[in-house]
Amino acid sequence: MQIVGDHLAELIPQGGTILTQCFGETIIGTVIRAARRQNKDFKVFCAETRPYLQGARLTSGCFAQMGFDTTVITDNMVAYAMEREGIDLFTSAADTIARDGHIANKIGTFQIAILAKYFGIPYYVTGIPDQDKHSKDDIVIEMRDPQQVLSYRGIPNTVPEVKAIYPSFDVVPPHLISGVVTDLSLIHI
């Protein structure tokens, strides 16, 4: 996976600003190491990634502890950050990459990809294509416990009569993706 980190780090402009979504444990570590080897410095904005807050709890800490200027934003601040904070590149890992170019990643990735396209910001996905997933129709979206949306750390954030849904992933169509960074190369879509 270090090769994936190397390829992704090459896409990040020196002194630039990137936006991340969720926490791709392996790729975060490899891109940080690659950026350090390439003497690259850049700012990082991490979407908090509710309801588990992987962006805030995990991704932001990795970048900050390695000396990158890191800022956490709530998931509903992405357009603001793209418009006013100089985001140069959006990146996420992919839980699934279908052979037709659709990807599945943590819920919220699709809306960020739409905003990136609107603002002309390239979106690069990291991962390995799934040979058994031919199209978006082969991607199954797991529904998780909606209680995780209705409370935070055991404290309810709404009244008991309110319901919630929690799809774990959403699917991003290939026309919103600039490229897929794999262990072999950068595949432009």
Residue ranges and their predicted role:
Residues 105-111:
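Charged helix-capping and loop-helix junction motifs
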Residues 187-189:
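Conserved small/polar residues in nucleotide/adenosyl-binding loops
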